């Protein structure tokens, strides 16, 4: 069946052989809980509360584990550095990383420092920083909060960057009187990108669409009353799940909620297939 990657409340990532159900390797290097992982072919990216991302080459796991066992058995050999599965360490966030999205050309992470970062995997450098609190305090970059009910606010088409329109949204109040969000450790609950469009869900209950070419938040979908924990979107719809016990289906063309699904418990994960 292939390979499975898992993370738990520990600082290692486990590699499983689904054909045998065996734990075949550990990805070691993080110094705090691993909060998110994603695999693309032979590469795995992990994000941790130690504020770093690590890129792993899964093809090196077997040789590295074999060398580790040999050293533990006392043959005196050191593990060659070239066999270490960790091929990149990305540092830049000031607090724990709680969400990531990754393909072979693009990596985006979200962290408790309330920023999103895009990374160059070749240089291990951050090439773009998107500040969620700045977007919240400058709503003209996303939605105009002064728009009357009969009016509409400009939005960004996720595929073509064209201006679309949607009705107004109400802005939620911070949980603390001083305006802070510190009660939400996982302030960024989910991120996903498609082309130049990036969607993020955060602790203020807002879903934002960003343009990766400019780093600007062009669109804000507000309606959830608790932190966003998960989301997924395609060319026409975005679906978000929240600790407010609801799943919302958004029309990306109009910005309106098409359907709200009520659940008995806080929603922590979702996936949809538009083909079914």
Residue ranges of predicted features:
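Short loop/turn segments that connect beta-strands within beta-propeller blades
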Residues: 18-21, 58-61, 121-124, 212-215, ...
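Hydrophobic beta-strand positions that form the internal "hydrophobic ladder"
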Residues: 4-5, 44, 107, 198, ...
């Amino acid at each position: 069946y292939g390979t499975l990657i898992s993370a738990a409340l520990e600082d290692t990532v486990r590699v499983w052989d689904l054909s045998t159900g065996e734990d075949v390797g550990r990805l070691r290097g993080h110094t705090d809980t691993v909060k998110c992982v994603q695999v693309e072919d032979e590469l795995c990216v992990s994000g941790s509360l130690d504020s770093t991302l690590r890129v792993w080459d899964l093809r090196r796991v077997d040789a590295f584990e074999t060398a580790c066992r040999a050293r533990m058995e006392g043959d005196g050999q050191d593990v060659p550095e070239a066999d270490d599965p960790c091929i990149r360490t990305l540092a830049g966030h000031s607090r724990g990383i709680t969400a990531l999205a990754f393909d072979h050309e693009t990596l985006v992470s979200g962290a408790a420092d309330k920023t999103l970062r895009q990374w160059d995997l070749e240089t291990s450098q951050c090439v773009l920083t998107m500040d969620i609190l700045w977007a919240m305090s400058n709503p003209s970059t996303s939605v105009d909060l002064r728009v009357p009910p009969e009016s509409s606010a400009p939005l960004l088409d996720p595929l073509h960057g064209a201006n679309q329109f949607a009705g107004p949204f109400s802005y939620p109040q911070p949980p603390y009187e001083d305006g802070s969000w510190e009660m939400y450790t996982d302030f960024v609950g989910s991120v996903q990108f498609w082309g130049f469009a990036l969607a993020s869900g955060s602790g203020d209950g807002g879903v934002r669409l960003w343009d990766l070419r400019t780093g600007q938040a062009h669109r804000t979908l507000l309606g959830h009353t608790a932190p966003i924990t998960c989301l997924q979107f395609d060319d026409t719809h975005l679906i978000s799940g929240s600790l407010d016990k609801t799943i919302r289906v958004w029309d990306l063309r109009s910005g309106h909620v098409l359907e709200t699904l009520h659940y008995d418990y806080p929603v922590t994960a979702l996936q949809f297939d538009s083909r079914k």
